């Protein structure tokens, strides 16, 4: 595959990579529910079922990313330069972004206090599950597809194309509103920029984990309303105008999230452009 023209390889990566992910997300959950969930027994907790789904689906995504990297000559698992430092920066960006989005929701008057809570061990287990989920997504999109496309068409095109694919595939996960899709594209651009700038996946994984993990396990904003199977430190619900997060999609479909992403992303794009070479095996 490495001897093929880079443009052909890039196009094939987008088509085959998108198709494989769509097929997995389309049929995988049903297969897990029919064949694996019964193995847990009738009394299995929601947290156990959620863990099984994430391990089965996102473990497969991670394996596909690593296999694809081996076939294409891309170091999918490359952490990038100064991984601890870049992970810290990524985590701070993720926490800052979600904080801005929540602030806009609070200003709009849609934030409500719920009644959920979570035990420490459950929250730690939930953190590991969220980490696996976001790490698998970053391995696939920013660790594999983005570098392959960047070889042919450069970092800018790669970040944009992979971000659009990232957003479209989330349609299979329930992201239905136009605002939600725009936010997913912007989030993909943010994670893609971090990957390209740092030369690896440590920074985007940390940013993605900080954003999703705090939204679910610290603030209890996903799902909305209520809390997930692992509980949350706080339980904030969003009720009111959908444009500020008052829908079932919560912050992900809010204008506040869009503003937060732009506040974080625009200065980064203005400050510097991604420069490192694509990592090769």
Predicted feature locations:
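Transmembrane helix-loop-helix hairpins at the membrane interface
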Residues: 120-280
């Amino acid at each position: 595959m490495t001897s093929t023209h880079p443009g052909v390889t890039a196009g094939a990566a987008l088509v085959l990579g998108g198709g494989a992910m769509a097929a997995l997300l389309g049929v995988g959950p049903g297969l897990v529910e029919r064949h694996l969930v019964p193995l847990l027994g009738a009394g299995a907790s929601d947290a156990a079922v959620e863990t099984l789904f994430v391990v089965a689906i996102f473990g497969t995504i991670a394996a596909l990313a690593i296999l694809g990297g081996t076939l294409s000559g891309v170091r999918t698992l490359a952490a990038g330069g100064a991984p601890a430092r870049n992970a810290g920066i990524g985590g701070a960006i993720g926490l800052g972004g979600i904080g801005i989005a929540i602030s806009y929701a609070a200003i709009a008057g849609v934030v409500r206090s719920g009644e959920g809570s979570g035990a420490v061990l459950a929250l730690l287990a939930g953190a590991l599950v969220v980490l696996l989920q976001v790490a698998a997504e970053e391995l696939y999109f920013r660790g594999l597809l983005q570098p392959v496309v960047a070889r042919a068409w450069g970092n800018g095109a790669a970040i944009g194309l992979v971000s659009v694919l990232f957003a479209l595939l989330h349609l299979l996960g329930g992201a239905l509103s136009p605002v939600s899709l725009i936010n997913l594209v912007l989030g993909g651009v943010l994670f893609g920029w971090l990957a390209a700038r740092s030369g690896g996946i440590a920074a985007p994984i940390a940013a993605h984990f900080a954003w999703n993990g705090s939204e679910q396990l610290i603030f209890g904003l996903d799902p909305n309303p209520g809390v997930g199977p692992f509980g949350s430190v706080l339980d904030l619900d969003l009720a009111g105008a959908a444009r500020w997060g008052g829908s079932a999609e919560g912050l992900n479909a809010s204008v506040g999230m869009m503003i937060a992403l732009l506040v974080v992303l625009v200065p980064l794009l203005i400050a510097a452009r991604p420069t490192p070479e694509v990592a090769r095996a």
